[in-house]
Amino acid sequence: MALKELRIGTRASQLALWQANWVKSELEKRYPDMTVTLTKIKTIGDKILDVPLAQVGGKGLFVKEIEEAMLRGEIDIAVHSMKDVPTEFPEGLGLYCITEREDPRDAVISNGVKFADLPQGARIGTSALRRQAQLLKVRPDLEMVIIRGNVQTRMDKLKTEGLDAVILAAAGLNRLGFADQITEMLPTDLSLPAIGQGALGIECNLSNQDVKDAISFFNSPDTSRAVRAERALLWRCEGGCQVPIAAFGEVTGDQLKLTGFIASVDGKVSVKGVVTGPADDCEKLGVKLAEQLLSEGGHAILAEVYQREVSREKEIPV
């Protein structure tokens, strides 16, 4: 049965609305008779802007309230930045589509100065412990300044906070038309992306076949396999915003190459690895690499990181 209406739930940030409106536009092009509406929902991650995400604690900081609206039957689908999506879902809900990936790399915005040329002790604004750890690993002299807010707000902090550079996801900058502000793209061997970075995920009630049929065209098989491998690694490591974990999957033909990274927040201790195998075994490859990283020092790193989190108690996977 063809759907007459589809209700999209989204955060209200500039980037989230761009993403949700893109999904809305694609649906309207494909189904001219369908009425597609947006519902803006404020998440806890949007409400708490004066504290680093690592200190807020918990998972799903940018999705929980949206999922609750779906469970109440107020929306049919949710559009998320994949890097915000936890590896576990409320009963009945799930990730049904992962869109083709935008540029997954991190970007430097500065006053025209490339990363390698930043002065000794340069102040770098970032919202991610993952970036902080990787950049400190190669430049321990840098001063990392945690910045929060939407893309424009974080870009503005280059001036308002007296920063030498800010590091942001290239995908968001490209989507919002800020590509001309980028000084340099960081190669993935220097700054491995966040899990799912650059891809969008569409979540729905998995029992609603009509909705699943309507949105299935959004799924990119190659991006989906790459991101599912990354997410399997994260799931095995039980990571969230509080831990510097990064992974990047690349599909070529029927093969998948997955690179993973776990580090201490200061970047002084880290472990990195690579696995390759059939792309159809994406989740098995993610777990395999996670177990390799954990056995080669990742377990001790995570134990140390979690030990410092007085607000959380968890068992570190062995």
Curated annotation (Swiss-Prot):
Catalytic activity: 4 porphobilinogen + H2O = hydroxymethylbilane + 4 NH4(+)
Similarity annotation: Belongs to the HMBS family.
A Pfam family that the UniProt record links to this protein: Porphobil_deamC
Additional note from the record: The porphobilinogen subunits are added to the dipyrromethane group.
Function: Tetrapolymerization of the monopyrrole PBG into the hydroxymethylbilane pre-uroporphyrinogen in several discrete steps.
GO biological process: protoporphyrinogen IX biosynthetic process
Protein encoded by which gene: hemC
UniProt GO cellular component terms: cytoplasm
Molecular function per GO: hydroxymethylbilane synthase activity
UniProt modified residues of type S-(dipyrrolylmethanemethyl)cysteine: C241
Co-factor requirement: dipyrromethane
Entry-linked InterPro entries: HemC, Porphobilin_deaminase_cofac_BS, Porphobilin_deaminase_N, Porphobilinogen_deaminase_C, Porphobilinogen_deaminase_C_sf
Protein name: Porphobilinogen deaminase
Quaternary data: Monomer.
UniProt keyword annotations, A-Z: Porphyrin biosynthesis, Transferase
Organism: Citrifermentans bemidjiense (strain ATCC BAA-1014 / DSM 16622 / JCM 12645 / Bem) (Geobacter bemidjiensis)
Gene3D superfamilies, sorted: Periplasmic binding protein-like II, Porphobilinogen deaminase, C-terminal domain
Keyword Glycoprotein: no
Cofactor: binding details: Binds 1 dipyrromethane group covalently.
Pathway: Porphyrin-containing compound metabolism; protoporphyrin-IX biosynthesis; coproporphyrinogen-III from 5-aminolevulinate: step 2/4
EC number annotated for this UniProt entry: 2.5.1.61
Enzyme kind, highest EC tier: transferase
